[in-house]
Amino acid sequence: MNRIAIGLHYDGAAFSGWQSQPHRNTVQDYLEDSIERFAGVRLLTTVAGRTDAGVHALGQVIHLDTTLDRTTFSWVRGINAFLPPSIALQWARPVDESFHARFLAFERMYYYALYTGPHRVPLAHGRAGYLMLPPGQRLDVDAMQAASRCLLGEQDFSSFRAAECQAKSPVKTMYDVTLKADGNWVFLRFRASAFLHHMVRNLMGCLVAVGRGRYPPEWLAEVLAARDRKLAAPTFMPDGLYLADVKYPEAYKIPAADPSASLFHGVFRHDAA
């Protein structure tokens, strides 16, 4: 039995999230259907992180087990031939049977693209969150960055956890929150050991509230300490959220994600990640 690790990108706008569902309009269902057409047998996948409806991926990782002996390029080219244009394999590589896409991941990174201009941007529809602020208004990105400092380190993120979250513990370690402003655009990067269900979108709701001046930066620390979801801002829209990268022990030689074909090309290039 061979274990294969696979990296893929997808535009989540048209899908009901990653996880397989009866109506089958999910990334997992399209992927496993395409693998079956390529391999001639149904192969089940294990994923690094299940994304919600409307959430995208630049660096999703899966693994599968198979008796097929194919070159890595054959896996990529063959499966891509059956996938819709909004899903694409980027790489495939054989890995030791000890590799596990979910349980061996020690860091995950998410990006969020937020447009704050006074009108919609059709070419970014479904691929960015938006506020449509009046002309001349800007989010206070410095206040948002200041507020985010309380999130760093090992924290109990219960205040930013969805009610249906199945994680055993709300305690996670946040390594970095970075914001970059470029005209009407604000780009955010979140790096952590792992994330709770809706955690990034709930943090986005709070950071945007601070950026609009509805709360001072220190309010976010109060919400974090309270461990009460009712005190946080509403969950922000999924459109601008991207699973950007997943990191594994170096021994497995899992390729880093490539954001060059996305809204984030060059945004965080000179920052340590």
From Swiss-Prot:
SUPFAM superfamilies registered for this protein in UniProt: Pseudouridine synthase
Active site positions, chain numbering: 52
Highest taxon of the lineage: Bacteria
Enzymatic reactions: uridine(38/39/40) in tRNA = pseudouridine(38/39/40) in tRNA
Binding site for substrate: 110
GO terms (BP aspect): tRNA pseudouridine synthesis
Keywords assigned by UniProt, alphabetized: Isomerase, tRNA processing
An MF annotation (GO) of this entry: RNA binding
S-S bonds: none
InterPro entries: PsdUridine_synth_cat_dom_sf (IPR020103), PsdUridine_synth_TruA (IPR001406), PsdUridine_synth_TruA_a/b_dom (IPR020097), PsdUridine_synth_TruA_C (IPR020095), TruA/RsuA/RluB/E/F_N (IPR020094)
E.C. number(s) listed in UniProt: 5.4.99.12
UniProt similarity note: Belongs to the tRNA pseudouridine synthase TruA family.
PANTHER family xref list: PSEUDOURIDYLATE SYNTHASE (PTHR11142), TRNA PSEUDOURIDINE SYNTHASE-LIKE 1 (PTHR11142:SF0)
Description of how the protein assembles with itself and partners: Homodimer.
Entry-linked NCBIfam families: hisT_truA (TIGR00071)
Function summary: Formation of pseudouridine at positions 38, 39 and 40 in the anticodon stem and loop of transfer RNAs.
Name the record gives this protein: tRNA pseudouridine synthase A
Species for this entry: Cupriavidus pinatubonensis (strain JMP 134 / LMG 1197)
